[in-house]
Regions:
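Beta-rich interaction/scaffold domains
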Residues: 19-127
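Low-complexity, serine/threonine/proline-enriched polar segments
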Residues: 146-190
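Short structured motifs
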Residues: 50-51, 231-235, 305-308
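Extracellular-facing segments of soluble proteins and assemblies that are Gly/Ser/Thr-biased and enriched
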Residues: 199-285
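Extracellular carbohydrate recognition and processing domains
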Residues: 284-329
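Short carbohydrate-recognition loop motifs
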Residues: 184-203
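Bacterial Sec-dependent N-terminal signal peptides
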Residues: 1-30
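Extracellular carbohydrate-recognition regions
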Residues: 119-165
């Protein structure tokens, strides 16, 4: 009896072990996405293997940080090395501002060569909230604006940032419609932008950040700093080459049913929204305003901001026009 049990157990172990095999190495060779400090937008044509990377007009083309998203296990290498290439920084200061890169699959059997071109661009002057950046594995919306260049004008490109990456840490939603910043189809014309204040759940309570307000801004969101210093996690600004006169648009607004502060309900108080644009001076490219000083910094030279009286609750699309007022001399 005992012998039969032992034999059965041995045969079962052998059967299980025979099913365990090494997983096949990935055979994909492609570039799925590209980001970087100056990158506003990356247009990838998978058929022609051509990538246009739009950066702001004042970017240093001899030192472009490019972070490529590749299939699992794949590697990438510039076909010709430049003396200025250091780690993920590449030199695109040649006349065509383009170079070729080859991706090799994890199994080493497949390669794909891409022509990558860096295109200097300016900020758009109108924003429509019509387009979302396709991003594999990202469930929240990332807005961008794109106006192709002509023979006489450079391209106009901007990628919007938001606090959505920080809200993802809460685990409160796995659907794009549950995020504080999202696209909606019933905008003033076509699509629009919806900003909502959301509960951060038990995760937010643990770090004493009980709510997350929807926001949208030009700049970047520093996810690594989101928990320890959330105000400084929002980095505002991009180089701009004109003198703005006014900020115009349309809004609707509905205040939340309750107003909370540090997790406690505050009676007889209502939340409000803010719309503003600032123009500020920076002595070096690395200098950026953040959430702690975006309205108070001495570097601000002009500001357009909606007044508290004008930021009213309304179910109808309401026009606003905010003139830029000079600041700090």
């Amino acid at each position: 009896m005992n012998f039969k049990k032992w034999t059965t157990a041995l045969m079962l172990a052998l059967a299980v072990s025979s099913c365990i095999q090494d997983e096949a190495l990935n055979s994909e060779a492609a570039i799925d996405a590209c980001t970087g400090a100056d990158v506003q937008l990356a247009h990838i044509n998978s058929d022609s293997k051509e990538i246009n990377i739009y950066v702001h007009k004042g970017a240093n083309l001899a030192k472009q940080q490019l972070l490529f998203t590749l299939p699992d296990g794949a590697t990438i290498k510039a076909d010709e090395h430049s003396p200025n290439d250091i780690l993920n920084n590449y030199d695109f200061s040649n006349e065509s501002h383009s170079r070729t890169f080859t991706v090799t699959s994890e199994d080493g059997e497949w390669t794909a060569t891409y022509t990558v071109k860096v295109v200097p661009a300016e900020m758009p002057e109108t924003f429509h909230f019509e387009d979302l950046l396709p991003s594999a594995g990202t469930e929240y919306d990332i807005f961008y604006e794109f106006e192709p260049g002509t023979s006489t004008n450079v391209s106009r490109v901007a990628q919007w940032s938001s606090g959505n990456p920080g809200y993802k840490l809460t685990g409160m939603t796995d659907n794009r419609t549950g995020y504080p910043t999202q696209q909606v189809t019933d905008g003033y014309r076509g699509n629009g932008l919806k900003l909502t204040t959301c509960d951060t759940g038990s995760f937010g309570a643990m770090v004493q950040m009980y709510i997350a307000a929807g926001n949208l801004f030009i700049g970047s969101f520093d996810l690594a700093n989101a928990l320890k210093d959330p105000l400084r996690a929002t980095k505002f600004g991009i180089q701009y080459y004109k003198r703005p006169i006014a900020l115009k648009g349309y809004f609707k607004f509905k205040a939340g049913e309750v107003y909370t502060d540090e997790g406690e309900v505050q009676k007889d108080m209502k939340d409000r929204f803010d719309i503003y644009a600032i123009l500020y001076e920076a002595n070096e490219n690395s200098f950026m305003l953040d959430g702690s000083n975006s309205l108070t910094s001495e570097n601000i030279v002009a500001k357009a901001q909606i007044s508290e009286e004008a930021a009213v609750e309304t179910d109808e699309w309401t026009a606003f026009e905010l003139p830029f007022e000079p600041m700090n001399g």
